């Protein structure tokens, strides 16, 4: 490898590390053109590290599933466990998004559909479990390209270390819905 190629690779590696640090350094995501403010890049970084992932969103769109699919698959290959709870609130979830997830990830992901017809279902949260702590993203982003990137969506991340009481409330609410108010897809 020529010296110029080595220098270019180092520059690209340093640039990637700088961008990753910028992305990871915020707990507030508001969407827009600045990728540091886009939830997508935060989720990708979290997926790369998590031992398990719990996602609860009111709807899934094929555009968003396509964006996350490779990293979800990589996490599963690493041994991470992934659970997804979604719904058909307002009839927005695209069947093609569900088929795509099932086709690519199969039974390796525990995917469920919220199953109460008399109660609205509109949560948007991504819970990442690591060794020793957990992160939760809560906000307005469902899984669609716009919601994960340039759309104006407000999301906030906090950890089980910084706010254990509220983290536990959200996590237990997820567990209750997932185990007792859903059907397996």
What is each stretch, according to the model?
Residues 1-185:
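PLD/PLD-like phosphodiesterase catalytic module centered on the HKD motif
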